[in-house]
Amino acid sequence: MGSDLKARLKAKFSRRSSTSGSVKSGHSHSHGETQLSQRDESRSLASTDNHSRPASVRLDPQSSSNLGAPAPAPDADEVPVRIVISPEDSTATSSSTASTLPSEEVQPQESVTRDPSSQLSAAPKRRAASDGPGNDLHHPMAATTSSLASINENQTLVDASIAASPPATKLPPSVSTSARNTAASSAAAAAAASAAVAVTAAAAAADPDNDDDDDDHLDPLHRGPAASDVLTPAPATAPAPVPATLSASSIARPTGPPRRQSLLPNRQDALIKTLLQAANINEADLTADHLLSINANMVTRKIWVKRAGASATLITINEDDLVDDVRDMILKKYTNSLGRHFDAPDLTLRIFPREERQERLLGPEEPMGRTIDAYFPGGQTVDEALVIDIPTRRTPRPSPRGAVSHPTAVYYAHDTGRPSEAGEGYFPPVGAIPSPNLEVPGAAPNGGPPPPHAIHIQHTGHLPHSISILGTGQVPPIPSPGRSHAYKTRPNRPQLGRTHTSSPTFINGVPSNVGGPPTAHPVHSSFHPRLPPSRTQSNASAESAAIVPPAPPLATPPAPEIPSAIQRISTPPPRIASPRPSSARPARKKIAPAHPVLPAGMLAGGVPPINVLIVEDNPINLKLLEAFVKRLKVRWKTAMNGRDAVKKWKGGGFHLVLMDIQLPIMNGLDATKEIRRLERVNSIGVFSSSASGVFSGSVTSEPEGTEGDIEDKDRLANIELFKSPVIIVALTASSLQSDRHEALAAGCNDFLTKPVNFVWLERKVMEWGCMQALIDFDGWRQWKDFAQDAEENDAAKKAAGVKAKSKKNRLSVTTAAA
């Protein structure tokens, strides 16, 4: 009986070993060698004497005494499983004990007594104990990589490998043996298979009559999944393997499409750089190719500049601009005051450092941004603005006390009171002081003695008064525009007192020409301190007693210490060629204005009172033109659009039309074309049939042939009032040459650009009035009489109004007294 059971067990063990090897080889090819080494070590431990084994795998005396003896049949509910685990290395002991494979000489190391009926019921319990994902105490890969440390191995390496593995959780003693087996390391897959073989051998020994059923029940090929469910815990879902190191390319930002337009303005380069640098702080490896290149002209800043004694202003410059570039920006900011008169290279910039250092001029090659940062580290304030210097005008001033080589140059030689270019005013704020050089030679043109200023040249030796005579030899007379005798009245203005080392002292009256006629030359006398005593005092008393000239009508207030003779001598002299003091006196009553105008009554007496038609849609401009023509004492009528202008022109009697181009209903050009068409149809002016024989050909025959064909709407009622074509002047705000050509082509005689210069327009009115007078001389005579009668009537009406007003005032006074 015992020998038969032993033979059957050997056959089963041999079959199980082959089956277990095939199952283990199916897990992983890479762990086959590890399982073979574990098997050899287990055999060596099994064949070793119990006293020679390590303490962790040594069997207790009871288990060692029962080796090789058949186990008694246990009870139905008692399945004791006893495993000796050393507390020092529980994982290694479990692996070494469970991975021991049976052989002919090796006995089971665990005393397992299990009933066949309870074997099936234990499987669900073990399955339930290993269901949770947290019950697996080891990594699922550790089951194939863990191996039993041999006796001859280096224990330090084994301990290092154990320390590298996750720590095992110690279970309390109340946990069952199956739970402890489940909580063991998942690296003991081979040990679980050996335990299954031991349990099968014990069951076969208990029931020897059920061999075939046991073989089928314990066959791993038939119940492979069940055996793994019973003895192997379910591994938890393993996370995806994470590489230890990540490459920079794997986390680099993907390259998107190129940015076509920046979200920020191109001058905010500092902000763009800051944002890009802040975004790249946490980047692993971001190459420069992923970023857009930034232009240098995007960097801008503002600096303070000002003119000397003026308010400061800000200008925008680039970061890399030089001082020469900044000067261009300054001219753009100062467009009117500097840009009209100076170029950028003419300007200079001065900088005032914060320290007690001297100011300095900035060179055109210096970088503006770096200079500002160097001198003003904390930033430039408005009080530290750069000062803009402009070049001083190098116009040569006339040299004082110079000789004048031309008689008419005396007026310009003493014109020291002219307003300066800086604009201090027309009249300098100085009292009336007679100029010591105001001398006009009276006998020089007639071959008389030399003038007094020639003697002055001998004593002073100065250069001529005007620097312009160096090239021409004389100073040509340049009278004021529009005034033929303006040079005589201009010295009436107060003269600017010049302070020189040779300042003259005022003495009594001195004649400028001894022996000359006393009636023609007393006004030419002047004071001069350098004249010889014999010439300056010979006839002074006689002339001063004989001549007592009256004071001029518009003489300036004299100084209190200067006598009347000095006042008379300080008046300007008349023209040299015609010494007529009586005729020159009335001319002193008027001062030449900036724009010379005609006298108030000149048009009324010299030009016929023409009739003007004003066509303007703007009421303000219309009122201005009405006031203008009213001041000229001419007749006028107004129209607000082109259609009314044509309708009023048909009434006749107009000589001048001021036509605005931009008009409602009918514009100015269309109205002009209509007026010219009606003039041509009605044969007015040069189209008349009564013209000279030159127009007896085809030019005049056409109006004669078409005279009877004139429509009623085109026929003029008062044809006798149309003596000549009317003068049409276009008024427009456009200054384009094309608009001018278009207006002239439509039939306009002239073209005026708004705003209109009324002085120029007054002259044009006189010109156009003279043209009308030449065309119709008889009518002009009648118009003149009519104008005189109208003036007389107006004067009578004004006198009557004044008389009535005075009478009314007297009545009111008497009534109040009563």
Swiss-Prot record:
A biological process term (GO) from this entry: phosphorelay signal transduction system
Domain Response regulatory: 611-769
Gene3D superfamilies: 3.40.50.2300
Keyword field contains Nucleotide-binding: no
Principal cellular location given in the protein's record: cytoplasm
Pfam annotation, one family: Response_reg
Function: Two-domain response regulator protein in the two-component signal transduction system of the HOG1 pathway. Modulates stress response, melanin biosynthesis and virulence via its regulation of the phosphorylation of HOG1.
Protein name per its UniProtKB record: Response regulator SSK1
